[in-house]
């Protein structure tokens, strides 16, 4: 059996590859392949596949990491049991065994222990080498030290059984191999928040039954204008005759996280095809905040208030 790739570029991924690159990686690959050729600018990038995740969680963990990992008294027995585990996966299994999503205090303690384990476990050299190699290629396509978005892409993110969109972390304006490695590990750790673990259990899944891929893509400077989310069907009714757009100022992360109330537009597809006015409904959002590149700290983003007069304007015209 051939060794699975640890990274896949967008031009090699499509919607048939969700098991390896996750929902976000597959969608971006599909967009890059089908839209770039007709003039739509899709930022290029690659996805660290679920094979990288599996390599990480199945690697041996050094005993020394436990010097930096404590645990509250209510789960001290779990920590002591996990110390005897040889791999990250087996230690995480101990941490999450028989977790009760209704016992929030205990679940919070378990989740904190699981994330500490992930953050303290060394990233295998094979993954570091792949990140270095593929990021160098991305720098050649754009410019040295190119700024990227590091975005979680779960294999269960948009499944029919449950939607995991927004459950896991993404990081913006990241630059340099070492920072990408660390942000990749933080994306993996975000699988083990109290919210994500509880959501898995409530939908009849074990947190380790799914894997996570992580997208590394060129940042689009939408903080200088606007961005948002578009659905090619109505997300509430499932009606496939319309496009639903949510738009706000700055980087799109605040829209994705539900932090801001965006402008919304419902666009009639047939109207577009017939060159008729296609907007059948629109609602002006409050758009109170926007996320931009940090003015002083490199490789950081910040949220600022949107001027009142801009809130009363449409972000898309």
Where are each of the predicted segments found?
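N-terminal beta-alpha lobe that positions the nucleotide/phosphoryl donor
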Residues: 1-215, 224, 297, 301-317
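NTP-handling and nucleic-acid-processing catalytic cores
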Residues: 170-272, 276
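Conserved catalytic alpha/beta cores of large enzymes that bind or transform nucleotide phosphates
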Residues: 242-317
């Amino acid at each position: 059996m051939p060794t699975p790739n640890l990274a896949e570029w967008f031009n090699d991924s499509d919607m048939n590859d969700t098991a390896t690159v996750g929902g976000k990686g597959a969608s971006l690959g599909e967009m890059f392949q089908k839209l770039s050729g007709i003039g739509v600018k899709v930022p290029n990038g690659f996805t660290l596949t679920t094979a990288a995740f599996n390599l990480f969680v199945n690697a041996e963990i050094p005993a020394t990491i436990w010097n930096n990992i404590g645990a509250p008294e209510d789960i001290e027995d779990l920590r002591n049991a996990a110390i005897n585990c040889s791999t990250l996966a087996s230690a995480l299994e101990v941490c999450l065994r028989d977790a009760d999503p209704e016992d929030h205090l205990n679940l919070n303690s378990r989740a904190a222990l699981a994330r500490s384990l992930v953050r303290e476990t060394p990233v295998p050299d094979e993954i570091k080498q792949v990140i270095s190699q593929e990021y160098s290629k991305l720098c050649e396509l754009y410019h040295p030290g190119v700024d990227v978005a590091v975005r979680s892409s779960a294999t269960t993110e948009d499944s029919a059984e449950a939607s995991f969109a927004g459950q896991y972390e993404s990081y913006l304006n990241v630059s340099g191999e070492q920072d990408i490695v660390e942000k990749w590990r933080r994306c993996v750790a975000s699988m083990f928040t109290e919210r994500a673990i509880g959501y898995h259990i409530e939908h009849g899944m074990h947190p380790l039954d799914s894997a996570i891929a992580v997208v590394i893509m060129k940042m689009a400077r939408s903080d200088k204008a606007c961005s948002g989310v578009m659905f090619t069907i109505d997300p509430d009714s499932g009606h496939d005759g319309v496009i639903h757009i949510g738009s706000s100022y700055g980087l799109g992360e605040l829209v994705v996280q539900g932090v801001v109330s965006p402008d919304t537009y419902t666009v009639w597809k047939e109207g577009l095809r017939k060159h008729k006015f296609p907007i059948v409904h629109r609602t002006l959002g409050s758009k109170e905040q926007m996320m931009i590149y940090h003015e002083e700290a490199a490789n950081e983003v910040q949220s600022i208030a949107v001027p009142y007069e801009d809130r009363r304007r449409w972000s898309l015209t």
